[in-house]
Amino acid sequence: MLSRLSAVWRPSRVALRIQRVDFTTCGNRLNRSTQPNEPPLVSGIAARSRTAKAEPVEKRGRAAIKIDSPPPPLEPPRISEEHMTRRRKVGGGKTKAAAVTKSKQRRSGRTVGASAFNTARRANGIEGSAPGKGGASDVAIDDDDDEKLVDEESKQLMQLLKEEALRREEEKKKRLRAKAAAEPTEVTDDKEYLSKLGVAERTQPVGTEAKISAQGKAEGASEGQTHFSDADADSQLPILTSLSPEQQRALRLALKGRNLFITGGAGSGKSLLIREIVYQLRHNKRRCVYVTATTGVAALNVRGSTVNSFAGVKFGDGDARQLLKWVRRSRRAAGRWRYCQTLIIDEISMMDPLLLDKLDVIARAIRRRNEPFGGIQVILCGDFLQLPPIPPRNKPQQKTEENAEAQEGGDPTDGTPAPSKLQYCFETSTWTSLNLITVILHKKFRQHDDLAFQQVLDELRVGSLSPESYELLLSRTVASKSSAKSRKKKDEDAGNDGVLPLTDAETTPAAAEKDRHVRLCATNKEVEMRNAKYFAALEPKGLPIYPSPNDGSSQQTGSSNGANSVTEEDTMRPLQVYRAYDAYSTHETEPETTEETTTGTQPSQPWVRFEDSTLPTDLALKVGTRVMVLQNISLRLGLVNGSVGEVVGFLHPLELVELVLRAPRERHFPSARGQELLERAGLPTLQDAFRCVDTALGQSLFYYLRERGIRRPEDASYGCVYGNTHCRDILRLVGLGKTESANAVHPLEMYLGGIAPQHVRLTRLPIVRLDLREGNHTSSDSGAVEDGGFANGSKRLPKHVYAFISPSSHQWYMGDQPVATRTQLPLRQAWAMTVHKAQGLTISHVEVAIHRFFSPGQAYVALSRSTRLDNIRLLDFNNASVHACPRAKEFYTVLEEEELDNEIEDDGTEGDEEALEGDGEYEGEVEE
């Protein structure tokens, strides 16, 4: 009996095993025999895998199994070897976390991505698809067909983006290799320097602080840099070839250990020079460099911290002795002062002069060296003719020029004002003791195409306009509604036949919506009112109701349509709300913080103010919202930080992938799904979808997918296109990051068909239409395009570029260690913004209500954001609105006279380019 059961069981078990064999191998073995009279070439275990009828027979007294003639062989599923090769290539490399999640779900009776996988198999023709119904043989698209789809403008644009992305990737690899090669030497040099300094034997906390500093460097090196955009990475690269002669002179002096004061007008490249100095000092000289600034906005621009946080003096209140006690109680603050070798302070013009004297006293006491700043190399950067210093908390800010002059008091002929009368840092005794070498940057990079505008800005900077410059600014004046009637009546009475002002272009919200100018205001209240006015006029009507940080509910809109109601209006013209995700970096001695902290800051890092970031805390977007892009997309195309565009639609990342991959198959007969995606994205044609730039990838998504061999929407998972970090950031921005559970599908396993519809709707990202500048409409590259086959010469580019905006991050640094991070879409509403927020940006079209400015230099900062005079619009301009501080003007007059003498003296002591080659002995010069 047992033998009979065994005989029946064995063939069945073999047949089950054969069913698990790869379909391609089974098909090749079964289909070798094509003639009916030819015996099948199947042997061994494969022959026994056929379905057969078993009959018991007698053999040697035992029951056996007699196998009749087998039925015709099974027809293998129709599947191409090319598809299987591509699936193995794209689907391989699952992470360990994905494997663990998949194993848990299998044990619980679920299969990861089963529905999406079956959908993909049916769409690929695996499960008996009929010819002409979407099978694999009918929809295969080769490279030649792709080339025919894309026009020449799109090809040229995609090629430029590809070359720029490859260049960034190659430079990033070089930077990582150089950093890895320099790490062991850097530790050795630090130990040697600390032994020379001889402070470890005098103070007990130094050894502990050195250990913590080394651990902090290791943690900073291990921090994930995935949040950095390509523009942030480019800012850390050596750029010696792009520096002007004045900038190269400042770099040589900095590498020789001199104390510097770098100044110049707006757009002269001060921030660019600071980044290059930091890069050279850290990588070539192995120096411990701390980059600081007087404001949080300026600190983010130079990737540093505020000077108050570095010094450990909180708000800087109190006398020097009280601040010194605070610093000595903070082990970290004291350690920063001891090990700092180069201190860079940006926007020195906005620092309280008394604070500079206090910092000098603290540095001398902590370092126990009776030298200016305890022997630290000090590099100051700023322009005293721009925004004035920030007053202390117990002093009101100056409102008018008359109040400023009244507060100055005293005899203007005195060389040294009383301490209570100090207004700028150059009036302090510490400034004189530093023996700063002044480097004035004269070349303007921002307005290099408009020489007349440069002359106007130079005169506006010192507060004295010539008649020609005044007429040029008056020609850009627009009368506001409140003063249009009074000005018209005044001109009629006076018979004024002078320059006629421009017409008011923003009489209605609809007209303002089409306008490209960004209003620069003096206060936050004006900005909020203007942005809310025009945002509420868009469809759907109303303003968003932002949820509290502790509220786990989804975003609600100000209209009747809630976040959970799915209507046609919500789908095509939605109201999307994104809340920034703020987090602190972990440290061994500090509690780990990885949750949202938008309502406050940690006591251990009170200096971090997330509202200082240009990335907004809450970002509400509709179709038609005017936005400003806060990261560089393409330097060659002029799509840089500060470019203004308009939101035209919203798509989920995988929906955009589906749209791009559907286009080749639906170029003749578009489907309803393809038309729906094209309409939801706000793209007029398929060519616009081809050249849509993904900010996460840095190039055209169509080009990127073609290089990866991804041709079908069913083959594109989230992991093979974007990755885990991209998905995690999006979920956090829409409030879904905390809903992850053990049974959730891993982001690398997600296909579009496996995501819940409500999650697809909430996690859609904006598509922004950006206008190329007039100088970027053509490309005159000498090299031929590889794939496109273009000849040498100019090629015309499209006037509009569409960008798919992905999350980005701003980081706060203490030295070279990131301490806090804000993640948000690099966009902000751009109907209006404050002058302080616009500092450091390049805005193409600017509108300025100059009659409302109250601080000296505020009008100059606002107008210098633009690149051309023709792109400026002034409201109620008059000559009284332009003024500069008399003390600052006198200071720069002296600097201009001494500049020539300093250059002659420096030329006699500098010698050759030894500093750039790294041959000089930097440490000896500083310590002596």
Swiss-Prot record:
Its EC number is 5.6.2.3. It is found in: Mitochondrion. ATP binds at residues 264-271. Residues 1-49 form a transit peptide. Residues 858-877 bind DNA. InterPro entries: AAA+_ATPase, DNA_helicase_pif1-like_DEAD, P-loop_NTPase, Pif1-like_2B_dom, PIF1_helicase. The keyword Nucleotide-binding applies. Disruption phenotype: Essential, it cannot be deleted. It comes from the Eukaryota. Residues 52-61 have a biased composition (Basic and acidic residues). Keywords: ATP-binding, DNA damage, DNA recombination, DNA repair, DNA-binding, Helicase, Hydrolase, Isomerase, Mitochondrion, Nucleotide-binding, Transit peptide. Its cofactor is Mg(2+). Residues 29-141, 176-231, 389-421, 481-513, 545-572, 585-607, 898-928 are annotated as: Disordered. Pfam families: PIF1, Pif1_2B_dom. The keyword Nucleotide-binding applies. CDD domains: DEXSc_Pif1_like, SF1_C_RecD. DNA-dependent ATPase and 5'-3' DNA helicase required for the maintenance of mitochondrial (kinetoplast) genome stability. Involved in processing of minicircle Okazaki fragments. Monomer. This is ATP-dependent DNA helicase PIF5. It comes from Trypanosoma brucei brucei (strain 927/4 GUTat10.1).
